[in-house]
Amino acid sequence: MGPGGPLLSPSRGFLLCKTGWHSNRLLGDCGPHTPVSTALSFIAVGMAAPSMKERQVCWGARDEYWKCLDENLEDASQCKKLRSSFESSCPQQWIKYFDKRRDYLKFKEKFEAGQFEPSETTAKS
């Protein structure tokens, strides 16, 4: 605990209560009389790692969505409900990662099969 209340690392993007470091994830104010447990509960919102059950639900939703894309020739409009389920089951950062990973895996699959066609700008250079 810092001299004026809970001390949290600025390198992690959070606040030192008395000095005014802030994070947009805080749900309330942190003053000199804020108990450490209260201040930490503000920080913990949205920060906890998913449990094993939550990870399994996320991966299952991702797999169902990817399967739908495969079955519908990448037509995302046919998989809107599964996309919504995927987005509500996984942390946003994971969704970005999984989307990029799928793009890479599809590119790699085409490249290894000799089906990769460079864009016109790449072919001209």
From Swiss-Prot:
Which CDD domains would you find in this protein's record? Answer: Cyt_c_Oxidase_VIb
Q: Where in the cell is it found?
A: Mitochondrion intermembrane space
Disulphide bonds in the chain: C58-C90, C68-C79
| Motif Cx10C motif in this chain | 79-90
Instruction: Extract the GO molecular function terms from the UniProt entry.
Output: copper ion binding; RNA binding
Superkingdom, natural source: Eukaryota
Q: What biological-process terms (Gene Ontology) are attached?
A: mitochondrial ATP synthesis coupled electron transport; mitochondrial cytochrome c oxidase assembly; respiratory chain complex IV assembly
Looking up Pfam families in the UniProt record yields: COX6B
Q: GO terms for CC?
A: mitochondrial intermembrane space; mitochondrion; nucleoplasm
Q: Which UniProt keywords apply?
A: Acetylation, Disease variant, Disulfide bond, Mitochondrion, Primary mitochondrial disease
Pinpoint motif Cx9C motif by residue range: 58-68
Q: Which residues form the CHCH domain?
A: 55-98
Q: Which PANTHER family match?
A: CYTOCHROME C OXIDASE ASSEMBLY FACTOR 6 HOMOLOG
> What disease is linked with this protein in Swiss-Prot or TrEMBL?
Mitochondrial complex IV deficiency, nuclear type 13: An autosomal recessive, infantile disorder with a fatal course in the first weeks of life, characterized by hypertrophic cardiomyopathy, left ventricular non-compaction, lactic acidosis, metabolic hypotonia, and mitochondrial complex IV deficiency.
So what does this one do?
Involved in the maturation of the mitochondrial respiratory chain complex IV subunit MT-CO2/COX2. Thereby, may regulate early steps of complex IV assembly. Mitochondrial respiratory chain complex IV or cytochrome c oxidase is the component of the respiratory chain that catalyzes the transfer of electrons from intermembrane space cytochrome c to molecular oxygen in the matrix and as a consequence contributes to the proton gradient involved in mitochondrial ATP synthesis. May also be required for efficient formation of respiratory supercomplexes comprised of complexes III and IV.
User: What does the annotation say about its assembly with partners?
Assistant: Interacts with COA1. Found in a complex with TMEM177, COX20, MT-CO2/COX2, COX18, SCO1 and SCO2. Interacts with MT-CO2/COX2 and SCO2. Interacts with SCO1. Interacts with COX20 in a MT-CO2/COX2- and COX18-dependent manner. Interacts with COX16.
Assigned protein family = Belongs to the cytochrome c oxidase subunit 6B family.
- For this entry, the protein name equals Cytochrome c oxidase assembly factor 6 homolog
